[in-house]
Amino acid sequence: MMQQQSIFTDALNEQGKHQPSRRTFMWALLKNWWFVLPLFLICWLPVWILTTLYIDDVERDFKQTTDAVGELQASVLRLNLKRNISTADILAGFVEINQGDVNGFEQNAEILYRSIGGISALQLAKDAKISHIFPLKGHEAAMGHDLLHDDLRRKEAYIAISSGKITVAGPFNLKQGGYALIARRPVFIPDYHSQIMQYPNFWGFANVLIMFDKVLEDGGLDTLTAQGFDYELWRFHPDTGQPQSLAGQAGLRENPLSSFEIQLPNALWYLAVQPRFAALSTSQEVAITTLNLLVRHC
């Protein structure tokens, strides 16, 4: 019995002598790198290429989806702003046709106010001083406001006069309370003797007041949030030239997936959009992990 165990042990020891160790195996691979490397590349390279192409395709689709959603909301915002701002042209036309006679302002302003949603108030500013407001309730504090002698309003008011076109001021805090945009259309009437010597035919302004929360509501920006996207509406401040966040997640503009321009008559706004969800779904991540495992065990 003892002799049989000895023979068995000797056989195992003899077999162990002939079995290569892990270190010996690795050394053999290194010595034969010219054979191992091509084999490794044959296994790894196709999988790496397929994985890269797959990820690129997913990210491209992800970017296209974000672009489509963001552009839709940017278009809605543009159209609503354009509609509301252009109301100042209609109001100015009423003054010009009547040669500065503003009798009937309230009746005409009420029609505009009720037919074009999103407007908070319509104003006339004869000689650049607010003289008529509809609706007056809630806006009484703005009556008599001298735009050309207000440090916060003067610059954009003079831009409107000198250009002869609609300008958009704000958003800023109002004297009567609230945060709003104001579209100003300068009105010029032949033979009118203006108080501003360099603009002798300048009658005043036709103004449209648009509350900023209404701009955001009508622009449907809350839809972006509901669909899983973060956004930032921003501009370069006309006085400082520095970026100013108007709404949304401040700082998102630094590295958004998509960005869109909102052109106003005398300003440019930007809408930055970034999805909150990952580019790759759980199933896609599983697929990529599987490919990686195949590479490792090839």
For the regions a protein language model found, what residue spans apply to each?
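N-terminal acidic, proline/glycine-rich, low-complexity intrinsically disordered segments
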Residues: 1-9
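Membrane-interface helix-start motif
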Residues: 29, 219, 274-295
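Intrinsically disordered, low-complexity polar/acidic regions
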Residues: 63, 67, 71, 96-270
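Non-transmembrane, amphipathic alpha-helical segments
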Residues: 29-33, 58, 76, 152, ...
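Short N-terminal secondary-structure initiator segments
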Residues: 20, 24-35, 66-82, 215-218
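Juxtamembrane extracytoplasmic/periplasmic/luminal helical "stalk" adjacent to the first N-terminal
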Residues: 39-100
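Juxtamembrane amphipathic/hinge helix adjacent to a transmembrane helix
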Residues: 8-21, 258-278
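Extreme N-terminal signal-anchor transmembrane helix of membrane signaling/transducer proteins, especially
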Residues: 8-56, 60, 134, 289-297
